[in-house]
């Protein structure tokens, strides 16, 4: 059985992004500001130096 998001041609990441946006849009205004703050993504880049 194929997942319905896969049948629609979506990756799981895109599907979860759509779901998260729908949840944030449905929030009451008092909770929406906090949800919008945390909705961004962040990455950390670490350069590894080779020590001999």
Swiss-Prot record:
Pfam families: ATP-synt_Eps (PF04627)
Modified residues (N6-succinyllysine): 21, 32, 37
Annotated keywords: Acetylation, ATP synthesis, CF(1), Hydrogen ion transport, Ion transport, Membrane, Mitochondrion, Mitochondrion inner membrane, Transport
Highest taxon of the lineage: Eukaryota
Modified residues (N6-acetyllysine): 21, 32, 37, 44
Biological processes per GO annotation: proton motive force-driven ATP synthesis; proton motive force-driven mitochondrial ATP synthesis
GO-annotated molecular function: P-type proton-exporting transporter activity; proton-transporting ATP synthase activity, rotational mechanism
InterPro entries per the UniProt record, alphabetical: ATP_synth_F1_esu_mt (IPR006721), ATP_synth_F1_esu_sf_mt (IPR036742)
GO cellular component labels: mitochondrial inner membrane; mitochondrion; proton-transporting ATP synthase complex
Subcellular location: Mitochondrion; Mitochondrion inner membrane
Coiled coil: none
Complex formation: Component of the ATP synthase complex composed at least of ATP5F1A/subunit alpha, ATP5F1B/subunit beta, ATP5MC1/subunit c (homooctomer), MT-ATP6/subunit a, MT-ATP8/subunit 8, ATP5ME/subunit e, ATP5MF/subunit f, ATP5MG/subunit g, ATP5MK/subunit k, ATP5MJ/subunit j, ATP5F1C/subunit gamma, ATP5F1D/subunit delta, ATP5F1E/subunit epsilon, ATP5PF/subunit F6, ATP5PB/subunit b, ATP5PD/subunit d, ATP5PO/subunit OSCP.
Function statement: Subunit epsilon, of the mitochondrial membrane ATP synthase complex (F(1)F(0) ATP synthase or Complex V) that produces ATP from ADP in the presence of a proton gradient across the membrane which is generated by electron transport complexes of the respiratory chain. ATP synthase complex consist of a soluble F(1) head domain - the catalytic core - and a membrane F(1) domain - the membrane proton channel. These two domains are linked by a central stalk rotating inside the F(1) region and a stationary peripheral stalk.
Family: Belongs to the eukaryotic ATPase epsilon family.
Protein's name in the database: ATP synthase F(1) complex subunit epsilon, mitochondrial
Organism: Mus musculus
């Amino acid at each position: 059985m194929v997942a319905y998001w896969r049948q629609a041609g979506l990756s799981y990441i895109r599907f979860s992004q759509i779901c998260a946006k729908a949840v944030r849009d449905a929030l009451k205004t008092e909770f929406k500001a906090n949800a919008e703050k945390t909705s961004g993504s962040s990455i950390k880049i670490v350069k590894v130096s080779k020590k001999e």
